[in-house]
């Protein structure tokens, strides 16, 4: 069923483009917006535009940060262990590990994984930026890279590729322990399981 209002249909169509949002959920979101005062809709629109205008990727770790805060707060923090870098697929995965409160090192966000079937190769994710962290002058002395990628075929392929690049540089390469279900996404794994996976990481 489609509504007689073209403006409402357009709003529903835009909501339906969001990840994990089907048409029914999009309809509920659209109806919620219509019920709320105009000021609420304006605040939502302003927040969306502000995020698009002011959120950037950290030039070092590729995590999200604000304009004017680059490198990001994690990269510049003196409280972090600069000898360890945890490589994750997305900023959401990084946040999942931060919520455990267990890991105290640095991060690198790939923004994807190698997936030949989808036409995604090493040049399409932040591999080059990762390697630069070990080859640039005055780079911190990193002794370990933890590969914390989702336990999927693509994640395993990416982990294998990265280990082959990093080992010749004399870097100790590990990956989080098994115990996370195959095919699961790290953002949905509970904090205790993620902590155990980090503690029990194994050599690649």
From Swiss-Prot:
Keyword entries, A-Z: DNA damage, DNA recombination, DNA repair, Metal-binding, Zinc, Zinc-finger
Domain Toprim: 83-181
InterPro entries hit by this protein: DNA_Rcmb_RecR (IPR000093), Rcmb_RecR (IPR023627), TOPRIM_dom (IPR006171), TOPRIM_RecR (IPR034137)
Coiled-coil residues: none
Protein name as annotated: Recombination protein RecR
GO biological process: DNA recombination; DNA repair
SMART domains in UniProt: TOPRIM
Signal sequence coordinates: none
Cited function: May play a role in DNA repair. It seems to be involved in an RecBC-independent recombinational process of DNA repair. It may act with RecF and RecO.
MF-aspect GO terms: DNA binding; zinc ion binding
Zinc keyword on record: yes
Family that this chain belongs to: Belongs to the RecR family.
Ranges annotated as C4-type zinc finger: 58-75
């Amino acid at each position: 069923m489609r509504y007689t209002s073209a403006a409402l249909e357009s709003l529903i169509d835009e909501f339906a483009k969001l990840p994990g949002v089907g048409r029914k959920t999009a309809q509920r979101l659209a109806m919620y917006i219509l019920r709320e005062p105009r000021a609420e809709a304006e605040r939502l629109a302003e927040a969306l535009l502000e995020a698009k205008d002011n959120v950037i990727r950290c030039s070092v770790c590729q995590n999200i940060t604000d304009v004017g805060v680059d490198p990001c707060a994690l990269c510049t923090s003196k409280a972090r262990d600069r000898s360890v870098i945890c490589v994750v697929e997305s900023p959401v995965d990084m946040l999942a590990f931060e919520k455990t409160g267990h890991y105290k090192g640095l991060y690198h966000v790939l923004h994807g994984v190698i997936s030949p079937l989808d036409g995604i190769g090493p040049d399409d994710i932040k591999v080059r930026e990762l390697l630069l962290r070990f080859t640039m002058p005055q780079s911190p002395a990193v002794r370990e890279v933890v590969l914390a990628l989702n336990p999927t075929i693509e994640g395993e392929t990416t982990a294998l590729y990265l280990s082959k690049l990093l080992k010749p540089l004399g870097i100790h390469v590990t990956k989080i322990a098994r115990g996370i279900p195959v095919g699961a996404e790290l953002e949905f794994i509970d904090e205790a399981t993620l902590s155990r996976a980090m503690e029990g990481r194994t050599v690649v």
